[in-house]
C-alpha cells in the first residue's frame, strides 16, 4: 500500500513529504491533488470527476487533465463534469449535455461543437480554438474544424497561407 501511495503521489505531482503532512497545512490545490491520489491508489476501473480542475492553477489543471487522459488511455473509464468547454474539447470523446437535470443531448465532442446555433440556444460557449477556426472558415479559410491543439492549428493556417 505504501509503494502504491508513493507512486500515485508522484503521478499527481506531489513528493513523499505529503504522506506525513496534516490536511490543515495544505493549500486548496494540494488538498485536491491528495484527494485524487487517494482515489487513484484504489485503482478504480471508473473515475468520476466533478470539476476536477477547480482550485488549481492553469499548469496544475493541465497536469491533472493529462493524468486523467492517461488513465482513460489505459483502458479505464473517465466521466468528467465540467463547464470548461476548452477542457471538454481537448480531453473528452463524448459529451452529455444536461438541461434542468435532464439529459438534453449525448454525442461526440466534434459533433456538439460543430452546432453553433444549438450551443448558443443552450448558453454553452464554444471552446476558444473552435470559435477561432469557425471564424477563419467563415472568412474563407478551409481549416479542419476538429483541430483541438494550437500547434496543429498554426500548421493548418500555415498550410492554407502557403498553399
Q: Locations of the language-model features?
A:
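H-loop/switch region of ABC-family ATPase nucleotide-binding domains
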Residues: 82-83
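Conserved ABC ATPase "signature" region
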Residues: 2-17
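A short, surface-exposed alpha-helical micro-motif characterized by mixed small hydrophobic
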Residues: 88-90
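Conserved ABC ATPase "signature" C-loop
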Residues: 100-101
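Conserved catalytic motifs of ABC-family nucleotide-binding domains
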Residues: 43
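Conserved ABC ATPase signature
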Residues: 22-26, 30
